[in-house]
Amino acid sequence: MTTLATLIFLVTLLFVLWQPKGLDIGITALTGAFIAVITGVVSFSDVFEVTGIVWNATLTFVSVILISLILDKVGLFEWSAIHMLHASKGNGLKMFVYIILLGAIVAAFFANDGAALILTPIVLAMVKNIGFSKRAIFPFIIASGFIADTTSLPLIVSNLVNIISADYFHVGFVRYFSRMIIPNLFSLLASIIVLWLYFRKAIPKTFDDNNIKHPKDAINDLKLFKISWIVLVILLFGYLISEFTKIPVSIFTGIIAFIFLMLARKSNAVNIKQVIKGAPWNIVLFSIGMYIVVFGLRNAGITLILAKILEYISNYGLFSTILGMGFISAFLSSIMNNMPTVLIDAIAIGQSNVHGMLKEGLIYANVIGSDLGPKITPIGSLATLLWLHVLTQKDVKISWGTYFKTGIIITIPVLFITLIGLYLTLIIF
């Protein structure tokens, strides 16, 4: 059973990351799940249990991405980025910091995938338009992709990993926010400092801002642009209401996304069919399929091994517990992707004999490691692989070697500082 469960998991993961001939990750994961079921590695009751765990998370994620795609077509993100350029007043370092801050805001409210895949092309087009050299463009591209994950901690909806973990342990919106806002601020500050130290020689000191277009020129539909702000406010209230009513957050995000789609249908700036097609629907199939495969590892007793390791680490106190869990999840995410990692770790945490604040430390450290760890390698998250593909289409080629060399140097210190932020949060608040 153990060998079979491990083999099914590894082969499924290999095909998910490899994607031969464009094989859809949803189909791959469901195939792995089907094999796991027919071989008896998982039962039909496991299938229903997995569906119960991931349906809210994945539908929330898809809804948020749908909303962000409409906002992108309206021009909200480009409008924001142009404001950042104007605020920089020709100062290269200010522009670098402001772009990072914008990325952090977008990641918080529209998920890491939305920030990386929507904001990066906008930033790339802008720095090219300003006339930056390839050497000067690289820091801005890396920063846009890096910050999308490192600051995707504050809200449950900021990352699919967050939603899945919060759902698994029944953590509400407000409680989650109260525990992760300080680590997110630590991560943001650490990211700015580490990225600046790493790229300081490549970032231009000044740039010509005379030819930058006016922010209003980025708006493709003024009426829908104004409505967008109302939608964002309602979305935030929806998150809060879900906390107190115990109604799944996907219900609120789904209704808001549907209404926004109906309003956008009349806009010439938004191609509804293109927006719906662009949503990551395959993530729903991938999540269900991959987690069924992961449940096979649980049934085979593999997650119990990790649970014992976590119990051992917890004997050394809260600080060691947080650092240990954070770096374990970061390492696992970097070598086998953060999606299966977060659930494997969550199952192990649930199986471990750890309680109280120590268990809370494990839960949130797992999220932090699974959010930040993927930046170490290109295979750490599906968003990174897609991000690299988008850049290649725009004639910006980043080799896996270059990415790894950059990723490991800038991720490790940021991860450590972020975990310190979590530790301080738990002992003070």
Curated annotation (Swiss-Prot):
Taken from the UniProt entry, a GO cellular component term is: plasma membrane
Its annotated compartments are: Cell membrane
Which Gene Ontology biological process is one annotated for this entry?
Answer: response to arsenic-containing substance
Pfam families cross-referenced by the UniProt entry: ArsB
Q: Where is the signal peptide?
A: none
Q: Which UniProt keywords apply?
A: Arsenical resistance, Cell membrane, Membrane, Transmembrane, Transmembrane helix, Transport
| Membrane-topology annotation of the record | Multi-pass membrane protein
Give one GO molecular function term: arsenite transmembrane transporter activity
Q: List where the protein spans the membrane.
A: 3-23, 25-45, 50-70, 99-119, 137-157, 180-200, 222-242, 244-264, 275-295, 316-336, 372-392, 408-428
Listed as disulfide-bonded, the cysteine pairs are none
Membership in a protein family: Belongs to the ArsB family.
Purpose: Involved in arsenical resistance. Thought to form the channel of an arsenite pump.
What's the name of the protein?
Answer: Arsenical pump membrane protein
